[in-house]
Every structure is written in C-alpha cells, then in structure tokens.
Amino acid sequence: MRRLFSILLSAFLLLGLAPIVNAAGEAVNADRAATDFTASALTTCSENTRFNERASQATTPKDIARFERYSKASCGDDGLPHLVIAATIEPWGALANRHHEGDILIPGHIFIYVAGIIGWSGREYLRASKKTKNPAENEIIIDFALARQCLIKGAAWPVEANKQGRSGDLREKDENISLNGPR
C-alpha cells in the first residue's frame, strides 16, 4: 500500500495534476487602490513611466546596466519587473517557455542540487563517524579529512540516493527507531 501511494503521489507531482491558481482577479495593494490584474496589464518596462523614472535615478554603471537588462522584461503599473509563466502548459511550462528557464528552472535545480549535497554530506559524515572509536567526539570536533571525503562523495548524491533507495539502506529500519519523547 505504501508503494502504491508513493507511486501515485509521484505521478501526480510529475504530471502536475494539482490545481492551478490563476493570477487574475482583484489585486489589492496597500499603496494604491485595487486594480484588476492580469498578465495583459503588464507593459514592456522600457515603455513604463514609473520604471523610466526609477531608471533615471540610477547613478552607478552597475545600476544602469541592470535597468538596461530589465527594460526588456514586463512591468506592472508599479514600475517593477514581473515574472510571468503561463500556467496553461504546466507541468512542462518552463521547458516549453524557454526564455524563462534562467528565472526559475536553472536556479531551482541548482538550489535543490546544492541543498542535496549539503544534506547528503552531513548524513554520510554522521554515518562514517559512527564507525570510529569515538563517534560522539567526531560529532563535536569535526574531522576535516573525513568531512572532505564525505563532501566529495556528496556531489553524486542523486545516484547514491537512488541506489540506497532501491537497496533499502536509505531509510532506517523500524526496530531501530525509539518512541521516547513527547507524544
């Protein structure tokens, strides 16, 4: 039953069968009156008066370059760039809408990969330190040689997680988990 549930959950997440929220309707902002917001209300930032006012106040070359880069984006009436991704082609929206992959797809994958490296390296360090003669000391005083080895191994965490998931080594056995503590 657990396996069936995990397969169904994975399929729902992969296929994007979750309800989609539309960004249309009343948008109430604290600094101005309620406006009817849709993606069609956005204009090119280079044509937006509030964006141009903000761009004219740029003083450093870095700020000027940033405003030039943002001038190609879509701005709302507040003069700030907005990211629009069509929800009609989900879950493959970022793949079909290639000019937004630098906004969400690539940074999201990098974040997940780096977070996985950190988590997997920490997990491997704790598992390796349990095999030493004084594991409690290795948790307090970090053995940098062991930590470096675990960090290097952590780069392959997706492959290792898949291997350990198939072999059953990824999860702790139920008999090794205590029920002490608040309930």
Curated annotation (Swiss-Prot):
Its main location: membrane. Residues 166-176 have a biased composition (Basic and acidic residues). It is a single-pass membrane protein. Residues 164-183 are annotated as: Disordered. One of its GO terms (biological process) is photosynthesis. The keyword Transmembrane helix applies. The chain crosses the membrane at residues 102-122. Residues 1-23 form the signal peptide. Belongs to the PsaF family. Probably participates in efficiency of electron transfer from plastocyanin to P700 (or cytochrome c553 in algae and cyanobacteria). This plastocyanin-docking protein contributes to the specific association of plastocyanin to PSI. This is Photosystem I reaction center subunit III. The lineage of its organism: Bacteria, Bacillati, Cyanobacteriota, Cyanophyceae, Synechococcales.
